[in-house]
Amino acid sequence: MPVCNFFLQGRCRYGDTCWNEHPTGGRGGDYRGNQQPSNRGGFGNRVWINPSQRGGGGSSSAGGSNEWGRGAASARDVQSSEFSFSQNRFSALETQRAGAEDTHTTLDTIQKEMEVWQTSGQWPFSCYSAVNRQISGFIELCPEELRLEYYTSRASGDIQPYINSVQQLANQWRSRVQELRNMSSSTQISVIAELKSSSPPASAPGFGSPGPGFGSATSGFGNTSLSSPPAGFGGAGFGSGPQSSSTFSFAQSKTDFGASNTQQASGFGSSAFAQPSSGFGNPAPSAASFSFAAADSESKPSAGGFGSASGFSFKTATAGQGSGFGSGFGSSSGFGSSSGFGSSSGFGSAFGSAAPAQSSSFGSTGGAADTQSGHGLFTANSELTPEELKEFMAKRFTLGQIPLRPPPADLLMI
């Protein structure tokens, strides 16, 4: 590939996309010095000049041409070595990427973004990073975390600590944003030192920080105790103190997800399944989290897994009546017949335990009594109108006149 003459002169407009070679370092001079003399007055994309038109005379045209070519190459070698190939317009971009970020530009960016953050009404409780490191003084909280803290405070009967904590965090955010928006010289020095520091950034204080935050031992997000043993989902989570209830436990002492419990909440990872009282750590008479049957006032405190008493009840069980989805796999059949697996209750309590109930939410032991009722699988002939009976007896239904009730049992062909 020929060497680019304009690159040697320092004015190649194509840069790295040039079709000719751009030698780097000391290769250019060595490459041209090792070339054989040429009668064209040079090589590459240089223009040949007639030696007779120069001051050398016609008799020495060949020799003059060779001398001129070598002389031009030597001159260009000196020019290229002095220029150091810095005329490439794309090298400035590489130098900019390799260099450090401009400090003043970074500070101006921080000030503008603080102004936008303060006036735009965006979510305030969020961290902030200008380049690749976080700026201290901000706390990261999502709306769901605040909502959970509100529900926890409301369940305890006192929401004033929650209100005070949110107001304190909002005031801290406003003061920090105002400080970064109107930086003093000391603030600029501290921000620059923080951006250039190699140590990990200090974590922002959470709800459980000293002061009127979201409490110390009662909060689920950053309590003061750091020495409590870690637990799964049910233990003292998120750094809470010992003997405190977890935020996400199904068996807290005071929460919306479970009833009162005199013991420490165990949750998924502790001894909830080994205790006689269950339902994810709750005692049997209390309400479990996601069960389908309400608590029976006279039921026995047997072990109740998924079938214990529920806060999301679909049917309230009374003292002589079975709960819907209540008993285990063996119960009187949900549709009237007896015993799927051997015990008696409507779909049973937790996985096979006995229940004093006899009836089911899906049906009773009456059997044929419900099959002929309007709420069963079939409809009696006496309850159908002549038009409906005619439609059931026809080979095809008439559009717009299809009955909305089940057909009689004697018209079904199995």
From Swiss-Prot:
The keyword Transport applies. Keywords: Membrane, Metal-binding, mRNA transport, Nuclear pore complex, Nucleus, Protein transport, Repeat, Translocation, Transport, Zinc, Zinc-finger. GO terms for molecular function: nuclear export signal receptor activity; zinc ion binding. It is found in: Nucleus, Nuclear pore complex; Nucleus membrane. GO terms for biological process: mRNA transport; protein transport. The keyword Disulfide bond does not apply. Its main location: nucleus. FG repeats lie at residues 43-44, 207-208, 214-215, 221-222, 233-234, 238-239, 257-258, 268-269, 280-281, 306-307, 325-326, 329-330, 335-336, 341-342, 347-348, 351-352, 362-363. SMART domains: ZnF_C3H1. It is a peripheral membrane protein. Residues 24-73, 200-221 are annotated as: Disordered. One of its GO terms (cellular component) is nuclear membrane. It comes from the Eukaryota. A zinc finger (C3H1-type) spans 1-25. The FG repeats are interaction sites for karyopherins (importins, exportins) and form probably an affinity gradient, guiding the transport proteins unidirectionally with their cargo through the NPC. Required for the export of mRNAs containing poly(A) tails from the nucleus into the cytoplasm. Probable component of the nuclear pore complex (NPC). This is Nucleoporin NUP42. The gene is nup42.
